[in-house]
Design a protein with these regions (language model features):
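A mature extracytoplasmic/lumenal domain signature
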Residues: 161-165, 225-227
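Mixed-charge, low-complexity intrinsically disordered segments
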Residues: 167-206
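Short, surface-exposed coil-to-beta transition loops
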Residues: 140-145, 205-211
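Short beta-strand edge/turn micro-motifs at domain boundaries
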Residues: 39, 207-231
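Core segments of small alpha/beta cavity-forming domains
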Residues: 38-147
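A short, structured loop/turn motif at beta-sheet edges
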Residues: 149-158, 214-220
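Membrane-interface motif at the C-terminal end of an N-terminal transmembrane signal
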Residues: 24-38
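N-terminal Sec-pathway targeting helices
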Residues: 3-19, 31
Length: 231
């Protein structure tokens, strides 16, 4: 009887592990508009989504949540500073932290100068030799992306994303808009995020699409360039 009980417990444990794996897959793949056909596993997808989320901002602050650039050193100064601010969750930031975070996100080849002076993103305290982040004022439209495809190559990934806005100005509903703020669809505020993504997937041609080039460097992913996908 004891042996049978142990066997049953082992079987139940296996079932729980399998179900947990399925649940994790569902959570991650719900942000995929199209499943990748390039042998990209769940862990890779999670890391890719986390990386792009770190650099995906707010168009009311930086004009574009994710601007195009052929080389990160040519990306707009404001966007780079705001990416750093988003990823350094501190009220007082040292120069070394600014430089280190920039390399963690954009790689060792970034050669942007970070002058010790104030700008739109940071105030600079000369006496303390620190940067102090300025406040960010956001509107009621959330800038969002979903991954539509991932191409895995020897050095990293080419990731295609679809960009859209979730308008929360009405408490009773969420309006899905493209980047020119044209209404594409709407859901009630009680409906899940999955329903919103279904609407986006059904209207892919009406949204902006970009390709994000990610490179593997020092056991992390760094952003190389971003291009617009032309229809």
């Amino acid at each position: 009887m004891l042996k049978w009980g142990k066997t049953l417990m082992k079987k139940m444990l296996i079932i729980i592990v399998v179900l947990a794996g399925i649940l994790i897959s569902m959570i991650i793949y719900k942000n995929m508009a199209v499943s990748s056909k390039n042998n990209v596993n769940i862990q890779e997808i999670k890391k890719i989504e986390e990386k792009i989320s770190k650099i995906y901002l707010w168009k009311e602050v930086t004009n574009e949540a994710l601007p195009e650039f052929e080389n990160v050193n040519n990306a707009t100064e404001l966007w780079i500073w705001e990416v750093l601010k988003k990823n350094i969750d501190k009220f007082e930031v040292s120069y070394d932290e600014i430089v280190q975070t920039s390399k963690e996100i954009f790689g060792q080849n970034i050669n942007k100068e970070f002058p010790k002076s104030g700008n739109v993103s940071y105030k600079y305290d000369v006496e303390k030799d620190i940067y102090i982040p300025t406040e960010v004022t956001l509107d009621q439209m959330e800038d969002v992306f979903i991954i539509s495809d991932i191409h895995k190559n020897e050095g990293g990934y080419e990731v295609e994303i679809i960009e859209y806005l979730e308008d929360y100005s009405n408490e009773q509903k969420v309006v899905i808009r493209n980047l020119v703020e044209e209404e594409i669809g709407q859901v009630s505020s009680s409906e899940s995020e999955t329903k919103i993504k279904e609407i986006v997937k059904e209207n892919v041609s009406r949204f902006n699409k970009k390709k994000v080039f990610l490179k593997k460097e020092d056991n992390r992913l760094i952003v190389q360039k971003v291009t617009k996908i032309q229809e």
